[in-house]
Structures are given as structure tokens and as C-alpha cells.
Amino acid sequence: MGQNLSTSNPLGFFPDHQLDPAFRANTNNPDWDFNPNKDTWPDANKVGAGAFGLGFTPPHGGLLGWSPQAQGIMQTLPANPPPASTNRQSGRQPTPLSPPLRTTHPQAMQWNSTTFHQTLQDPRVRGLYLPAGGSSSGTVNPVPTTASPTLSTSSRIGDPALNMENITSGFLGPLLVLQAGFFLLTRILTIPQSLDSWWTSLSFLGGTTVCLGQNSQSPTSNHSPTSCPPTCVGYRWMCLRRFIIFLFILLLCLIFLLVLLDYQGMLPVCPLIPGSSTTSTGPCRTCTTPAQGTSMYPSCCCTKPSDGNCTCIPIPSSWAFGKFLWEWASARFSWLSLLVPFVQWFVGLSPTVWLSVIWMMWYWGPSLYNTLSPFLPLLPIFFYLWVYI
């Protein structure tokens, strides 16, 4: 391709050879030899690519000349940086000096020791700051309030400040109790479901717990026997199991309440004394036989004769209810008395008993924890009742 940029107008666009003023070519000087960038005439006849595409511009550049801008070649030049502003200084400037106090607070300059003592001579100010008969030369002491109760609030300026600590505790206290109650409620509601899962797992030892009612006349999708839909045959059995579980939980709470009432001395339970056929509960006027030892819990009055006197026997309250149940059951089921020697013998083997308990806890501990973990939320409730009731 030719490199001559100053050919003698082979396509006839212009009457002159070179019109680019860069090499002093104009109508007065049509000679194109001033352009040093030229080749021989056969190379100049070759068509080059220019601003109008291949074959539309001669090798000397097209309609506007041979310069790169005329041929459509754009050259990006770096923009000159803007001139530095004359009203801007680089770096952190020092803080200007504060104006003097006499300029910013002229009223403060009016108060000096002389002005202050002169102000104290005012009876209104003197009555607020100085006691009756006091001098203004000494230290200013607050005076006790001598106003009447009806006018005591008039001396206060503005509303009293709110105690944010009391307000915060007033809001946070019930909120924390509500949150703890909701947490315990949600945990307690999982107790029947956990016990139901344990109950149904006894029927699927080593297998998958799948409801057996899904292949009946009204088939349902695969589901656990603890979550049967109402259309499943096992739905009524699930309700029966949960009803029994709720009764068991209520019985457990009732037993704990009875033991708690007995521990607090609110449930006078009197065991049967050997050789006596009558028992009584409640207070007695006098005791024919004083209580043995000292006890912080109320004694139990038993064997009430006809004269109104009774024998007071101190009963450990934590064992009173259990002992009462044992004696009540032994009086009606004689075969229970045969278990007493066996229990005494078993308790006498203390090392063996402890080793057995340790072995059972080591072997059954994880499974027992998974079974009894739903009952853990009941422990704070029982502890609260035990302490505060």
C-alpha cells in the first residue's frame, strides 16, 4: 500500500495537488513536493483505507487531507490537569483561636466577688441561700426547708428527673418473666411428644418407626406413629397414649406438691404407732409425752385419748409422706412386709450397691438422659415452689 500522502489528486476531488496547509500547500503554491512523505507515482496510485473505508479514499488521505484526524484516526491525548485552586490549601489547618470570654460571654464578666456579695444582700437571694441571721461573708450553706407542706412543691424548679433504673427494671422484669415462661411452656409441651416417641419405639426395636395404619382401607402417606393424621387408624391410639402421659405428668406434679406441703408442715401426716389403733391429725392442747429431740418442723400429734391429751412425735417431714404410704400399704397388703428384710440386706451391701448404680448409670445414662431431658424444664419450677412456698 502506498505511503504517499501528497499525490497529485488522482481521483480528481480537488483541482490542486495538496491542500494541507501544514506543508504550505495552497492555491498559490500548488507544488506538492514540499511534503517529504511521498513515494513514487505507481505506489501513489494504490488505494488506501481512510475515513470513508477501503477503496473510497486516495492514499493521500481523503477529502480533508493526510493528517490522522482527516483520515478518521482518533488519538486519545491525556487531558491537562485542572489548575490548582488559589483559595485552597493542602494539609490540616490549625484550629483558629477562640475569641476571648469577654467577647463571647459578656454577662460572665459582670460576676466577681464584689458583685456576688452585693447580690447576696438582696433579701430574696439571702432567704434562699443563707439561714436566718447568717452573714454573707462566710461559706454559703443551704437552708433547711421551712415552707409549709402545701407550698413545698412550689420551690422546685422544673419537673423531677425520671429514675431510668426503676423504669428499666419495671419493663425488663415482666419481659424476662414472660420470656422464661414461654420457654418453659414450649419445653413442657415437648414432654408428651418425647414420651410418646419413647413409648412407640418399644414396638419397633431395631427398626424404623412407621405407622402401621397406612396400609389400611384409608391409606395415608408414610408418617411417624407419633404424628398420625385424623384419617389414620392409629390416630385414636396416639390420643390415648398422650392422655395417659398427661395423667402421668399430673400425678407426678401432685406427688411433688404433697411432698412439698408435708415438708413445709402444712400436711400433718401421722404414722401408725405400734400398739395403737387410733390416730388423729391436727393440733392438740397438751402433750402427755414431749417430742423427742428438737425439730424445726411441727410435730405430728398421734394417739389422741379421750381426755384430749395426745403424744407428740417428731416426724422428719421429708420422709413423712413416704412412710405414711408404706405403712398404709403394709396394713392392707401383708406380703409387702416380706420385702423389708430384703431391702435391709440390699442396703447393707453398700459397696455392691454403689458399684451397681455406677455401672447402670454408665450403661443406661445416655439413653436415660435422652428420655428424661424433656423433664428438665420442670426442675426450675419445682425448685421455685420448694424455696418460696
From Swiss-Prot:
Biased composition (Low complexity): 142-154
Residues annotated as glycosylated: 309
Keywords linked to the UniProt accession: Acetylation, Caveolin-mediated endocytosis of virus by host, Fusion of virus membrane with host endosomal membrane, Fusion of virus membrane with host membrane, Glycoprotein, Host-virus interaction, Lipoprotein, Membrane, Myristate, Transmembrane, Transmembrane helix, Viral attachment to host cell, Viral envelope protein, Viral penetration into host cytoplasm, Virion, Virus endocytosis by host, Virus entry into host cell
Polar residues: bias regions: 85-95
Gene that produces this protein: S
Organism, scientific name: Hepatitis B virus genotype D subtype ayw (isolate Australia/AustKW/1991)
Protein name: Large envelope protein
Function: The large envelope protein exists in two topological conformations, one which is termed 'external' or Le-HBsAg and the other 'internal' or Li-HBsAg. In its external conformation the protein attaches the virus to cell receptors and thereby initiating infection. This interaction determines the species specificity and liver tropism. This attachment induces virion internalization predominantly through caveolin-mediated endocytosis. The large envelope protein also assures fusion between virion membrane and endosomal membrane. The middle envelope protein plays an important role in the budding of the virion. It is involved in the induction of budding in a nucleocapsid independent way. In this process the majority of envelope proteins bud to form subviral lipoprotein particles of 22 nm of diameter that do not contain a nucleocapsid.
Localization annotation: Virion membrane
